[in-house]
């Protein structure tokens, strides 16, 4: 078994094994098996870093075996600098989420942790797939465990939220399936994504392909105006579900733009870049303003995610090295920061059972250790230098200035909104006098919560202070992508 197969199937097999346990039996054993499975999945990604060769844009760790031979469908995996970091990020967040749900989940424990481990493997599969059908299978299969996580362990309106999540993302993907089949026919019967990158395609077909992929990926990111499912889903999802959704699942859509939309339809991508930039700026500015008026902490952070992902798509479609690399760095940083923000909300919700900002105030007086972590993650969400939230956004702004000064100015101005809604929430929840009896009786974080938040704090600070390892791996692949996109496919 190759290294990528090991990274994909280790958590999936542990997840399937967990499903064999009884509904609420052996909960203690289940938790330990889940943690061992998550750690094994993370350890399986370590050799990838050691063996990754810098300076080459070629796919590495390639595995290829026949799957459905009649239609030339292959189990074809590979990693390059663009996709590399999302594999260990997914495995890392899975470990954190297992720790987060350790004491909180008391019903259907084996199914809960099993669903998360299976979801982890499927998401890694999306980032590794080099066959169109294999990508589609992994991409769509991620909906099933997340649908169950929201629908079973979510809030009072969980069924509505689960259906909305499932239908929005599934309907968007149907057009992508049509595009994949068209490319299969056009290429003479191949689902090889890398072969599709070299396929000559006329202008009209490129435009249709671009918008077919846009339908699938824009909903997943989500971009404005197809973002409306995200706040509803975050509000109802359990804490672990929100953390994984924000930290990893939103990245599947953004990754799709780099693997499909831009290299397969480069002329259409350049032609419609202005539209993508406008939609991205609307997400950053307008959705940032919407976040400022939210009274529900989860909704505020959900809208914050839409705004931060707007920086990602903005970076991609300004078509320069700083923009694309900055977008990728922002994706990784957002994985750490947004996951941490949702887990902090979960810590409070487990104690007070309210997500309303008005229910809190003065939390720093009763939970000083927790408030210190919350302050760090809030500063990272604002884009404070020396935190992970700063690096990607700064690179995107520099890339935007390089492309057009006024575009860069608009992007930089939008950072003000991020600071405004984050600091407004922090002030009302953590500072000031103790608001009510619920807050007055709060206990500070326990050892499990301290470990969970410490892991994320280390990641946020390390990436903010020393981002070079992250950018070093992606630079060559980003340069190759931009070189490819700059060449017209029109005859």
Question: Across the structure, where does each feature detected by a protein language model lie?
Answer:
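Transmembrane helix-loop-helix hairpins at membrane boundaries of multipass inner-membrane proteins
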Residues: 2-3, 17-114, 190, 194-198, ...
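Central hydrophobic cores of alpha-helical transmembrane segments in multi-pass inner-membrane proteins
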Residues: 5-21, 35-48, 89-101, 119-121, ...
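Alpha-helical transmembrane segments of multipass membrane proteins
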Residues: 15-20, 46, 95-99, 121-125, ...
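Juxtamembrane/interfacial segments at transmembrane-helix boundaries in multi-pass membrane proteins
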Residues: 52-74, 173-232, 257-275, 323, ...
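Predominantly late transmembrane helices and immediately cytosolic-facing juxtamembrane segments
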Residues: 224, 338-342, 408-441
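Alpha-helical multi-pass transmembrane bundles of energy-transducing inner-membrane proteins
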Residues: 24-29, 114-118, 122-205, 290-303, ...
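Structural signature of hydrophobic alpha-helical transmembrane segments
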Residues: 1-10, 79-90, 132-145, 204-219, ...
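C-terminal ends of transmembrane helices
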Residues: 16-27, 94-106, 148-158, 220-235, ...
């Amino acid at each position: 078994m190759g290294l990528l197969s090991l990274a994909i199937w280790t958590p999936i097999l542990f997840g399937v094994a967990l499903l064999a346990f009884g509904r609420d039996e052996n909960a203690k054993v289940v938790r330990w098996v889940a943690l061992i499975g998550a750690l094994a999945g993370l350890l399986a990604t370590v050799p990838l870093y050691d063996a990754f060769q810098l300076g080459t844009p070629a796919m590495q760790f390639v595995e290829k075996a026949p799957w459905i031979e009649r239609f030339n469908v292959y189990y074809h995996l590979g990693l390059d600098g663009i996709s590399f970091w999302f594999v260990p990020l997914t495995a890392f967040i899975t470990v954190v989420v297992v720790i987060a749900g350790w004491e909180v989940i008391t019903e259907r424990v084996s199914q809960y942790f099993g669903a998360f481990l299976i979801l982890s493997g499927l998401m890694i599969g999306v980032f590794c797939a080099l066959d169109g059908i294999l990508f589609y299978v992994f991409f769509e299969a991620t909906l099933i465990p997340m649908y169950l996580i929201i629908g079973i362990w979510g809030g009072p309106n969980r069924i509505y939220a689960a259906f909305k999540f499932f239908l929005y993302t599934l309907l968007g993907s149907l057009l992508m399936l049509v595009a994949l089949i068209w490319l299969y026919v056009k290429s003479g019967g191949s689902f090889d994504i890398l072969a599709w990158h070299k396929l000559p395609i006329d202008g009209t077909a490129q435009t249709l392909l671009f918008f077919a992929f846009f339908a699938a990926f824009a909903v997943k990111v989500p971009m404005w105006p197809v973002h409306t499912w995200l706040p509803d889903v975050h509000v109802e999802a359990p804490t672990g579900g929100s953390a994984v959704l924000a930290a990893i699942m939103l990245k599947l859509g953004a990754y799709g733009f780099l693997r499909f939309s831009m290299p397969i339809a480069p002329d259409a991508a350049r032609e419609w870049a202005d539209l993508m930039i406008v939609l991205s700026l609307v997400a950053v500015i307008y959705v940032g303003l919407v976040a400022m008026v939210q009274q529900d902490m989860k909704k505020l952070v959900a809208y914050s995610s839409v705004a931060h992902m707007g920086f990602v798509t903005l970076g991609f479609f300004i078509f320069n090295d700083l923009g694309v690399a900055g977008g990728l760095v922002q994706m990784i940083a957002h994985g750490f920061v947004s996951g941490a923000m949702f887990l902090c909300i979960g810590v409070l919700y487990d104690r007070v059972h309210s997500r309303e900002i008005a229910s809190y105030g003065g939390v720093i007086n009763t939970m000083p250790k927790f408030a210190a972590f919350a302050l760090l993650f809030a500063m990272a969400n604002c884009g404070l230098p020396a935190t992970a939230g700063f690096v990607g956004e700064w690179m995107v702004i520099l890339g935007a200035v390089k492309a057009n000064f006024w575009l860069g100015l608009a992007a930089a101005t939008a950072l003000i909104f991020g600071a405004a809604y984050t600091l407004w929430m922090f002030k009302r929840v953590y500072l000031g006098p103790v608001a009510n009896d619920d807050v007055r009786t709060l206990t500070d974080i326990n050892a499990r919560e301290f470990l969970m938040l410490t892991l994320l704090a280390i990641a946020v600070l390390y990436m903010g202070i020393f981002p070079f390892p992250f950018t070093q791996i992606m630079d060559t692949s980003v340069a190759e992508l931009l070189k490819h996109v700059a060449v017209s496919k029109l005859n």
